[in-house]
Amino acid sequence: MDIEKVRSRFIKHFDGKTGNIYMSPGRINLIGEHTDYNGGFVFPGAVDKGIMAEIRPNGTDTVMLYSIDLKDRVEFKVNDPEGPRASWARYIYGICQEMMSLGVEVKGFNAAFYGDVPLGAGMSSSAALESCFAFALNDLFGDNKVSKWDLALAGQATEHKYIGVNCGIMDQFASVFGKEGKLMRLDCNSREFEYFPFNPQGYKLCLVNSKVKHELAGSPYNDRRNSCENVVKHIAAKHPEAKFETLRDCTWEQLEEVRAEVGEEDYSRAHFVLGEKDRVLAVCDALEKGDYETVGQKMYETHYGLSKEYEVSCEELDFLNDVAKENGVTGSRIMGGGFGGCTINLVKDDIYDKFVEDVTAKFTAKYGHAPEIYPVVISEGSHKVC
């Protein structure tokens, strides 16, 4: 990211004095999809694209913000019970409120920021913005006493209370805890996590953005969640002696016991979730051995499950996955909730340029617009730049 871009705008739009510069990254999730609300594992990593902000206390009770990307300026009082109307500024307002609830005496400050996280690519630009300001306020006003977990939870609470998005914790977790060259297996039940090496010599990791988003009738995500909960309910009824809260607690044998009762649709969805738990663990094992071929194979298996069992793919994403296979890409799958968005791809260096050229040409010919392609590198989490 461009430090000079932030500094020059900060000096221009405020009083000519410099502040501290902070950066928080967006994220990818290599594998572990639709597992968070089923108590399973996710496997994210921070990337080399994110939000960078220059921030300096201004000695007042007013927060003065400048969005470099939007060329927009917003001010609000730290203790204003309403907060700003501008949607982008509400993320920062929410973080101020959450940090104060954690005991940080937030005062007025000046801030200029920009981002290079591609919008609509499922890389969590909003979590990067929240994490950047939470980290900065902890440093500037809190003597860094607030824990990393509480910084991540402050971002999640901001989404819930001030934005109206009922998100999970993965995005903020990855932005705060990320490490260069490491992916993180997060247990969504216990919030325990472990770092795993991701140094794919001879490979590139890239996202291919279909730039489509299908709006479906009804509530497709709630439907799938209800399917999973229905399976758990039926298994729990057969095993009153055991404690079943999510599919994470269930075995393959128990799923087979209730197959006829729950019906094929609910069975297939639960089958995907149990398989995804096993695939995450297999990928962790493969990474410790440096076995990226197995990592790629599990990515393809996840795409198949998301498409055929969980049924959250779409024609465009399946097409991108097929083109990846045709080009000998090591691994490819849907990343994110589905029904549009991106695939994440593990591509050998020696075929990367050919793959980019081929997928761009074929997708454009079929759908009338080019996909966007973003190479990403697994990078450091939230930090002070200077």
Residue ranges of model-derived segments:
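Gly/Ser-rich oxyanion-binding loop with an adjacent helix/lid
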Residues: 1-22, 28, 32, 37, ...
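Short, charge-rich binding segments
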Residues: 44-46, 54-57, 103
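FabD-like malonyl-/acyl-CoA
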Residues: 128, 342-346
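Glycine-rich phosphate-binding loop
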Residues: 339
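C-terminal nucleotide
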Residues: 2-27, 52-85, 182-331, 346-386
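Short Gly/aromatic-enriched secondary-structure transition segments
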Residues: 39-46, 224-225
